[in-house]
Amino acid sequence: MSPEFPPFLSPCMNITNMLHKCVAWTIEYYSEDVRLEIAAMPFGIRAAYVRLTEMLQEFGLDLRMPHSRAMGGGLFELRPRGKEGIARVFYCTMVGRRIVVLHSFIKKTQETPKRELDVARKRQKEVCGS
């Protein structure tokens, strides 16, 4: 007779995998337009973004420089870089280990343009209520 496993625990799943799946962060997008803007970024930047989001799902708020940076007031930025340039992707977090991607842009200057930051903060207020 084979042992019965609870539906969430298959025989091939070890405890480490189970714990990892339980604590992983989920990533959502403010809108379909935000997701499409990121999908339209140059290949190298997009590849870096995918790698960073995988790290973000695993480490959440523990992801730090040079990959992510706190912008203050609960707003954060991912910092994807490719041979084509540098992008910034703003996000906030919500209860239930949820990350909401708010806005993205390709950097052309050393400083983050105020307009880009304002868009992210406005969306953060709408979504995260902070």
Language-model features: where?
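ATP-dependent carboxylate-activation loops
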Residues: L102
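Portal/gating segments that form or line small-molecule/metal binding sites
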Residues: V89
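Basic, Lys/Arg-enriched alpha-helical interface segments
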Residues: S2-I86, V95-R98, I106-S130
